[in-house]
Curated annotation (Swiss-Prot):
It catalyses: dCTP + H2O + H(+) = dUTP + NH4(+). Pathway: Pyrimidine metabolism; dUMP biosynthesis; dUMP from dCTP (dUTP route): step 1/2. Catalyzes the deamination of dCTP to dUTP. This is dCTP deaminase. One of its GO terms (molecular function) is nucleotide binding. Belongs to the dCTP deaminase family. It comes from Roseiflexus castenholzii (strain DSM 13941 / HLO8). InterPro entries: dCTP_deaminase, dUTPase-like_sf, dUTPase_trimeric. The active site is at 133 (proton donor/acceptor). Its EC number is 3.5.4.13.
Amino acid sequence: MTIKSDRWIQVMAREYGMIEPFVAEQVRGGIISYGLSSYGYDMRVADEFKVFTNVFNTLVDPKHFDPRSFVDIRGDYCDIPPNSFALARSVEYFRIPRNVLCIVLGKSTIARCGIIVNVTPLEPEWCGYVTIEISNTTPLPARIYANEGIAQVLFLESDEPPLVSYADKAGKYQNQTGVVPPRL
């Protein structure tokens, strides 16, 4: 596998529609940066959030997750309660090529504040808005700003395509359009 450069990302975004909307440079200056970087793409977080609350639960069970566990918030920012988490989605829509796997890592500016961003790999031929898990590990509320950088996407190209892609197996998160809670 080879990590792909800004040149490759730019061509794939423009010709294949791999990232929409695509920002061809790093946007910075008083904000958490986003856009094209040397070997990746810094995606933004949209203004839709689902913040976890324990009002309806005494146990978090991925096999029996109660969607009432989330409070929907839409705005320029989201304050995540102490020791809690939120789900959000990317501003960008991604179309991953068949021979590419993406690894997504939280931005250091956010991590250095005790806010951890988790996204599972974007698999070959997965399409959709990325659901982003954001954990506040601090004892204070933590603010996330909509339409600013949240995580960097690294593109790894394989020397051969997989036998079965995410699209082939009709993955349960294929073509997601909003913030998507856990599914079985």
